[in-house]
């Protein structure tokens, strides 16, 4: 089957998005639907993955949605690019590590096309870059695999309010900074989503 590309122009409620993803997983499992790459944005939302620790909440007044993806606590909201993938790993030798590498390399390659030197870190998962020799996280990754079908995906901070990260220890990483592409490299990123889609499709078909 081919990969469907879906782009939402208005913010999508997080739980509504997860419901859609889970339904697509079931449809793919029955060979009733195509795989999916979905570009969207969420309203301001804190989510906690399966590795979540209560000590990562600094502001106890915030509402948190516990979710099935891997990883710890993070924030989603306006100005952030979300990319969800529903991909059948049965067709890819059930290699989760390779699939994660495809996602990471697609993000890095896409950012490189904007002149951004980005890299992954095996110890601290996500995509990083440097400004004035300081490491800063600009993309977070978290997936879930059910019946060897992967869903959830990643987020890239483009022009969002990073003060929300002060309420948590993002991804449980205490000694690193979180930033946005606009804060580090002030340029137009309107074509970034298209670049990511192109690179993901190319690498997923290899």
Name each model feature, range by range:
Residues 1-138, 145, 190:
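N-terminal lobe of the biotin/lipoate ligase/transferase fold
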Residues 48, 151-152, 165-167:
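Short active-site-adjacent structural elements
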Residues 128, 162-206:
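C-terminal accessory segment of soluble enzyme catalytic cores
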Residues 149-159:
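Conserved phosphate/anionic-ligand binding catalytic regions in large, soluble enzymes, centered on
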């Amino acid at each position: 089957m081919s990969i469907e590309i879906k782009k939402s122009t208005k913010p999508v409620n997080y739980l509504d998005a997860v419901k859609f993803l889970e339904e697509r997983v079931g449809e793919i499992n029955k060979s009733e639907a195509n795989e999916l790459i979905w570009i969207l944005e969420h309203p301001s939302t804190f989510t906690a993955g399966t590795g979540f620790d209560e000590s990562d909440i600094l502001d106890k007044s915030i509402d948190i949605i516990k979710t099935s993806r891997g990883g710890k606590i993070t924030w989603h909201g306006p100005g952030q690019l979300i990319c969800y993938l529903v991909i059948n790993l049965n067709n890819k030798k059930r290699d989760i590590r390779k699939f994660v590498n495809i996602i990471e390399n697609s993000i890095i390659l896409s950012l490189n096309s904007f002149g951004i030197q980005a890299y992954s870190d095996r110890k601290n998962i996500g995509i990083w870059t440097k400004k004035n020799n300081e490491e800063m996280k600009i993309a977070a990754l978290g997936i879930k695999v059910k019946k060897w079908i992967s869903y959830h995906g990643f987020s890239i901070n483009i022009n969002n309010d990073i003060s929300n990260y002060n309420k948590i220890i993002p991804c449980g990483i205490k000694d690193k900074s979180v930033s946005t592409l606009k804060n580090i490299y002030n340029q137009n990123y309107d074509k970034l989503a298209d670049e990511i889609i192109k690179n993901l499709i190319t690498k997923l078909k290899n």
